[in-house]
A protein has these predicted regions:
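N-terminal glycine-/serine-/threonine-rich beta1-alpha1-beta2 phosphate-ribose binding loop
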Residues: 1-55, 61-79
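N-terminal Rossmann-like dinucleotide-binding module
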Residues: 1-9, 86-89, 99, 178
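A structural signal for well-ordered alpha-helical segments within the folded catalytic domains
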Residues: 40, 44, 67, 89-93, ...
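A contiguous active-site-proximal alpha/beta segment in oxidoreductase catalytic domains
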Residues: 52-54, 59-137
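Rossmann-like dinucleotide-binding domain that binds NAD(P)(H)
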Residues: 136-197
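Residues that line or immediately flank small-molecule/substrate-binding pockets and catalytic motifs
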Residues: 34, 111-114, 142, 194
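Local beta-strand N-terminus motif with an aromatic residue
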Residues: 27-30, 104-107, 187
Length: 197
């Protein structure tokens, strides 16, 4: 809030609970960029409160959550958009145009690979959450567990209570691009390996 105030002169109201924000502010549009395990509940609540929703990928923690999100926005008559930045990046769009032009010839198979840092890490001891952080609210619909700095800030994607790992984080982008290009609704086969010892 202080940074926004320094840049604009306006100081936004702060809320610790999204439900209070929805009730008091009655926003027309909500942007959800919270950890993945909150996406479904917050999207459904925002749609039911009368807001259009832009939600970062992945939509939900499970297929059932994602379906519930779609149903809630349909029932409310509001629009939901999922944040997939590779749909709008100029090099991705031009690459898609090239692939669809037929200039690459007949494509018989598509494979995607995602590689990244991984492997064993030294465990960090649990600790108290940072001052001012409501750890119970952060955990929300996930099982309450002790705070650990491997989870927050930024590491939540490696913990399945909060996200779906690398496949749910980066795999969403790669799978979406192939489905976008091929105009298929679903992959025919998915095989994934990985993990931490």
């Amino acid at each position: 809030a202080e940074e926004v105030h320094d840049l604009s002169g306006d100081k936004p109201k702060l809320y610790k609970d999204y439900r209070e924000l929805l009730e008091k502010e009655k926003p027309e549009i909500v942007i959800i960029s919270t950890p993945d395990h909150w996406h479904a509940l917050q999207t459904i609540a925002a749609a039911r409160a009368g807001a259009h929703v832009f939600v970062e990928k992945p939509t939900g923690h499970t297929i059932q959550e994602s379906r519930a999100m779609v149903n809630a926005t349909r029932d409310s008559g509001k629009t939901i958009q999922v944040g997939l930045h590779r749909r709008i990046g100029p090099h991705h769009v031009s690459g898609m145009e090239f692939l669809r032009s037929g200039k690459v010839g007949k494509v018989g198979m598509v494979r995607m690979f995602v590689a990244g840092a991984g492997g064993a890490e030294k465990p960090r001891p649990n600790s108290e959450p940072p001052e001012g952080m409501d750890w119970d609210m952060y955990c929300g619909p996930a099982p309450l567990r002790p705070f650990n700095s491997r989870i927050h800030p930024g590491g939540f994607r490696h913990f399945l209570d909060f996200a779906n790992g690398t496949l749910g984080d980066w795999g969403v982008h790669w799978l979406d691009q192939v489905l976008w290009w091929t105009e298929e609704k679903y992959p025919r086969r998915v095989y994934s390996t990985g993990g931490r010892p």
